[in-house]
């Protein structure tokens, strides 16, 4: 039996709709609904693992051996299956190296493979930088449609890079009253590029404020989004005092920051998948947060310290499926942790792949006409 698969480069992905913000947000909503129904598989014996990561050594006696010689140096393989209308398997693979920036390359270079659920045969091999960026922005926005105040007008972006752009575009798509953006960045170049992006792509935003400090950026904001790249030392994470946070704010965290324990314990704490954080808690024993720098692992550390109970960590799927009420007042502060899962990449990748097939986009490549050894 012959097998071929579709190769989609970045231009093909754009032509097939990978940048459709509203479509991606809806795909994430459907994904998490399926997740809540247990119609998925992740890696690992308990089907709850983020993926498998290669960590590089600091030194080696072997010439040319890859080293951990800078921030964010790793390889990750992330397999998954997603059911429902998607009924597709696949894997995201990425290599991350901050030194890429000096070569004119993105920090991370990502690819997604989609596979037939029954045979394992490849269906598609696709450029995934935009795919991953879009789903990373769409997940917080999907959650914001349940967790943010309906009258939210001001959003803060701490870290105006690629993820900041996709997050803001997605927030705008689900929060019709947003009209003001407060931005805190590290370089004038990133601030200028982000401001230009807003003016060209997001006419709903009428006011842009460039802030000199995190405190200035988060004060009086209805939605606060951290999309920063952090270093390994927790003390280097941006610090946020609870006194700066407006009542009723939603703090969206696909990144890391430092909060006072008592403040976090007073907030409603929501995660994308509590089992994911439990798996990290088991793999990286307490304290987990310095090792896995996603705020949900800080929640599990607080649980370990007896400052919160396990039931204080709420799954977004329980809110989507109406097993939990979600926001119960306009005054409560909610912190949402986004760990990221390959089911999200498979969902959006599968959607774009099927669009590409319908539109005749991409290059069909043969695997074999007949397997040589079968």
Q: Where do the model's predicted regions map?
A:
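N-terminal ligand-binding/catalytic initiation module
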Residues: 1-135, 139-141, 151, 343, ...
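Short acidic low-complexity segments
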Residues: 206-221, 239-240
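Short helix-loop-beta connector
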Residues: 147-154, 177-178, 246
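NAD(P)-binding Rossmann-fold cofactor-contacting core
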Residues: 174-201
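Short glycine-/small-residue-rich Rossmann-like dinucleotide-binding loops
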Residues: 228-232, 255-256, 274
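Adenosine-phosphate binding glycine-rich loop
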Residues: 10-18, 257-372
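Rossmann-fold NAD(P) dinucleotide-binding segment
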Residues: 219, 231-249
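Glycine-rich Rossmann-fold phosphate-binding loop(s) that bind the pyrophosphate
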Residues: 160-161
């Amino acid at each position: 039996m012959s097998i071929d698969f579709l190769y989609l480069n970045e231009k093909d992905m754009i032509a097939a709709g990978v940048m459709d913000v509203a479509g991606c947000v809806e795909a994430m909503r459907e994904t998490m609904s399926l997740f809540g129904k247990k119609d998925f598989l992740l890696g690992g014996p308990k089907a709850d693992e983020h993926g498998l990561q290669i960590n590089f050594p600091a030194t080696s006696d072997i010439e040319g051996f890859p080293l951990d010689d800078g921030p964010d140096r790793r390889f990750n393989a992330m397999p998954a299956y997603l059911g429902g209308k998607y009924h597709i398997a696949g894997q995201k693979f990425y290599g991350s190296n901050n030194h890429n920036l000096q070569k004119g390359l993105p920090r991370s270079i990502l690819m997604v493979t989609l596979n037939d659920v029954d045979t394992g045969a490849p269906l598609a091999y696709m450029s995934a930088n935009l795919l991953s960026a879009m789903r990373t922005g769409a997940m917080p926005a999907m959650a914001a449609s349940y967790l943010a105040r309906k009258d939210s007008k001001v959003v803060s972006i701490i870290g105006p890079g690629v993820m900041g752009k996709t997050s803001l575009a997605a927030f705008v798509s689900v929060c019709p009253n947003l009209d003001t953006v407060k931005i805190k960045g590290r370089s004038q170049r990133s601030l200028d590029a982000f401001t230009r992006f807003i003016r060209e792509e997001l006419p709903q935003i009428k006011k842009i404020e460039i802030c000199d400090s995190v405190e200035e950026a988060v004060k009086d904001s209805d939605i606060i989004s951290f999309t920063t790249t952090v270093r390994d030392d927790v003390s280097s994470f941006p610090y946020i005092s609870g006194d700066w946070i407006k009542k009723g704010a939603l703090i969206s965290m696909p990144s890391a920051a430092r909060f006072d324990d008592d403040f976090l314990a007073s907030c409603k704490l929501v995660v994308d998948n509590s089992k994911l954080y439990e798996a990290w808690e088991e793999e990286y024993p307490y304290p987990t947060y310095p090792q896995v720098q996603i705020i949900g692992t800080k929640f599990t550390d607080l649980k370990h310290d007896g400052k919160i109970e396990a039931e204080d960590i709420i799954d977004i799927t329980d809110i989507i499926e109406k097993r939990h009420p979600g926001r119960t007042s306009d005054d409560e502060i909610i912190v949402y942790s986004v760990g990221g899962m390959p089911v999200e990449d498979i969902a959006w990748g599968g959607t774009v792949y099927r669009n590409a097939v319908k539109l005749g986009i991409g290059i069909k490549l043969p695997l074999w006409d007949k397997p040589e050894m079968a």
